[in-house]
């Protein structure tokens, strides 16, 4: 007897609960407590996207009283709330159970394999190379010269004519280790992490009698 099942699910994520509450009425200095500007757009709303995660899974089971086989595969694909952040994950599971010698001997073997690749994960709880630091620290309403956050979003890099390369464009001297243009980090300093995991399990059980095995 064989049984096949397929399941799929999709979830949507928003960054509503992790965003600090900002004041958008005073600007002019880095501490964001300058003159009253009668309100300013909250650019953090435009920075975060709607995350989408889709999981598809397929399983197959078949067998008889003497032997049972089970196989499953699951695929996860997600796009995070920060631009460029994504996750791909594959899970494989195979299990075989067999009975011998009039069900006195049972052999159970299982293998579980996982492959995962993540792109542009934000640093959790850290300052360095974290795009959220520049996003949250940027002065409300813009900086000297009338340059607001959208200007640095659209012009995160500028040409260094002397070296003929593109430099980071940020209101703090091209950025520091602790605060940089978020879009420079996302587009020019991407990160990727890959994980592999394989688990093997084998058990052999022999039943001598009803009391001992």
What are these regions (language model features)?
Residues 1, 64-65, 84:
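Intrinsic structural disorder
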Residues 2-41, 81-82, 91, 95-199:
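Surface-exposed loop/interface segments of Gram-negative outer-membrane beta-barrel transport/assembly proteins
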Residues 43-47:
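Short, P/G- and charge-enriched loop/turn segments at secondary-structure junctions
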Residues 49-68, 73-76, 182-213:
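Outer-membrane beta-barrel transmembrane strands
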Residues 52-53, 81-83:
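Solvent-exposed loop/turn segments connecting transmembrane beta-strands
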Residues 53-55, 87-93:
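Transmembrane beta-barrel architecture of outer membranes
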